[in-house]
Amino acid sequence: MRESKSDRSSARGEPVRLRVIEAAERLLRQDKAEFSMRELAAEAGVSFATPFNQFGSKAAIMHAISARRVELMDARFRKAAPPGDAPDRMLVAVDTAASVMLEEPVVNRSVMGWIGTASPAPGTALARSEAFWSLALAAGDGLAPAARKQALLTLPRQLAFGFRGVLSFWTAGELADDDLAAHAREMAMAILLGVVDGQRQSNGNPAQQEPE
């Protein structure tokens, strides 16, 4: 199949987009969340127009950084290939997501602050987050059979909402770094509680217990 002109342009533009994203991350690490697009262009070693041409706005760059974080969560979860059923995997996914956010708290707090505000065009953070939680749920083993079909349709979005809520308090400084994972786990267990297989709960599965 012949490669289209737009495909070739996209392939050529990807290294430039990456340079801009990485430059933005470097500025954020220096606690320069209010950097200008001119400062960003200088840091990336590109023309002033390039960040606009590649992304359109600063908000879009922040969304791109956020997307990279979710991609990292996804890759690490897949690599871990955790055993157990859906609730077990969900807690591993929560821990994975929290650990990614805590690796660069200064950068990620700044990004969360940006993507939580209105932007010229809607982002894809919700869709990406839903996809990550869907990955952990898989076929829903360990969920109540009668509720499983509906749960698989609704849980990914509810977990996306819940995790974003926990992150919002962390971003605002109301949750310490050391508390992020524990509160995120509590959120996930509360959401799952109503749809977990009753037999599983009666067996005292570790996923329903507090982490040590």
Predicted feature locations:
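Short hydrophobic/aromatic patch on the recognition helix
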Residues: G45-F55
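Alpha-helical DNA-contacting segments of helix-turn-helix folds
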Residues: L28, I61-R69, V111, I115, ...
